[in-house]
Design a protein with these regions (language model features):
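Accessory RNA-recognition modules of RNA-modification enzymes
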Residues: 2-364, 369-371, 375, 383
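C-terminal substrate-binding/active-site "lid" region of AdoMet-derived donor-dependent transferases
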Residues: 377-381, 385-431
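Rossmann-like AdoMet/SAM-dependent catalytic core
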Residues: 433-436
Length: 437
């Protein structure tokens, strides 16, 4: 179950208002870091609760016409055996919104995430999948893993973190999920008056960098290393660009994708939403000089670096474009999920001339919203024998899984990784193979 999956409650929140406290039995975990509860027929998404508990829930959002109300567990009447004292003093109702599950033991956090992945695929794709969320190497206690942290700055120039679904800032003197090198920069002791936020990056190669926003005139470039069984290399990345925040994530994901796709010499491969070229470069080494790899990315901070990261592989090409634009997919005309686009009337876009008409392999690594129906249709039209889908949102993966099935691609393998311990976030890597034309 995910937020918004329940029918609209007549009259919105009914008799529940912000600040009300009610005692409820807690049901299953929901996608988004909540658990589901009900009070007199009203659906509640309750943070800081665990399945099977009885808690006192304080309503935090109750809007007219909303399908559910949001709440925080501010008291626990009957506790789950998996409940623990959060290690961070800033975790809990009304405090920092960065972590969702610090009140659960780490193994149970992964059970909750596993339940979410299975439920999303069942409900949105009609598939019953036997998958378990796996731990990544390192950070055995789920702390000290986050190598990139964005701190907000308050009116007094102090760095801190924001509350859940709020612009309100919580001043902090530590962040337990941050890599210790992030905190060693002294970012939380400095005066950042005049800045909106401060980014701190602790790369795998070299010293941490601190980037005030908007104060930085030139954003530093850092080096990130991948040291895997199937691929090793170093990458230039903008300190404000995208790179996986868990130190073991990039290596694990590249090895997993290569293992699933099994590239062959001479293959043509597409890396869609390519970032700085992580998967493109790994594929280029596998397909060799007789193969071809095309990386598609729109963020100029990433494409500049991708071209440098791929420079040693003449068989690669970086296409600077949004993936939908590269395929000639019309932009949506109204706000909505990428899977429910409404094409601009009368607007026709040309497919990018450097996209190959066919491909042997495709890597899809879309943003949280997913690839969407139209992009999936274009990917399927390439006729690739295999598609690897790297997903940071299980709901988007499930929707796109259904779209791929419509075009003859079946889910053949799925792995899920706890790349963000203490939070509700996770990463999935799925393999799809063409089963019909």
């Amino acid at each position: 179950m995910s937020e918004g999956s329940e029918p609209t409650v007549p009259g919105g929140a009914g008799d529940l208002s912000v600040g009300d406290e009610v005692e409820v039995e807690v049901g299953p975990v929901a996608h988004g870091g909540f658990c589901v509860a009900r009070h007199e027929g009203r659906v509640m998404f309750v943070r800081h609760a665990l399945p099977g508990e009885r808690v006192v829930a304080r309503v935090t959002e109750a809007r007219e016409g909303q399908r559910f109300v949001r709440a925080d567990a501010v008291g626990v009447t009957t506790a789950s055996p998996h409940r623990v004292q959060p290690p961070c003093p800033y975790a809990g109702p009304g405090r920092c919104g960065g972590c969702d599950f610090q009140h659960a033991d780490l193994a149970y956090q992964r059970e909750l995430k596993t339940a979410v992945v299975r439920e999303q695929l069942s409900r949105l794709a009609g598939l019953e999948v036997d998958v378990e969320v796996e731990a990544l190497p390192g950070a055995p206690d789920g702390l000290g893993w986050r190598t990139r942290v964005e701190f907000a700055v308050d009116e007094n120039g102090r760095a801190g973190l924001r509350k859940h679904r709020s612009h309100d800032l919580v001043p902090v003197d530590t962040c337990l999920i941050a890599d210790p090198r992030v905190l060693a920069t002294g970012v939380l002791e400095q005066d950042w008056a005049g800045e909106q936020s401060v980014d701190v990056v602790a790369p795998s190669v070299g010293e941490p960098v601190v980037v005030p926003v908007p104060g930085a005139e030139a954003v530093p470039v850092v080096t990130e290393a991948v040291r895997g069984d199937r691929f090793s290399g170093e990458f230039e990345v903008s300190a404000r660009g995208f790179w996986q925040v868990h130190p073991a994530a990039a290596t694990t994901f590249v090895d997993t994708v290569l293992g699933m796709l099994a590239p062959r010499a001479g293959d043509t491969a597409l890396d869609l939403y390519a970032g700085v070229g992580l998967f493109a470069r790994a594929l280029a080494e596998q397909v060799g000089p007789t193969g071809r790899v095309v990386a598609v990315e729109s963020d100029p901070r990433a494409t500049d670096k991708a071209e440098r990261n791929l420079a040693a592989h003449p068989s690669t090409l970086v296409v600077r474009a949004r993936v939908d634009d590269a395929f000639g997919v019309p932009r949506p005309t109204r706000k909505g999920s990428s899977g429910n686009r409404r094409a601009a009337r009368g607007r026709k876009l040309r497919r990018h001339p450097m996209l190959p008409p066919t491909a042997d392999l495709v890597v899809l690594d879309p943003p949280r919203t997913g690839a969407g129906r139209e992009v999936v249709a274009q990917v399927a039209a390439l006729g690739a024998r295999a598609v690897a889908y790297v997903a940071c949102d299980p709901a988007a993966l499930a929707r796109d899984t259904a779209y791929l099935a419509d075009h003859g691609y079946a889910l053949q393998a799925l792995r899920a990784f706890d790349a963000f311990p203490m939070t509700h976030h996770l990463e999935c890597i799925a393999l799809f193979e063409r089963t019909r034309t």
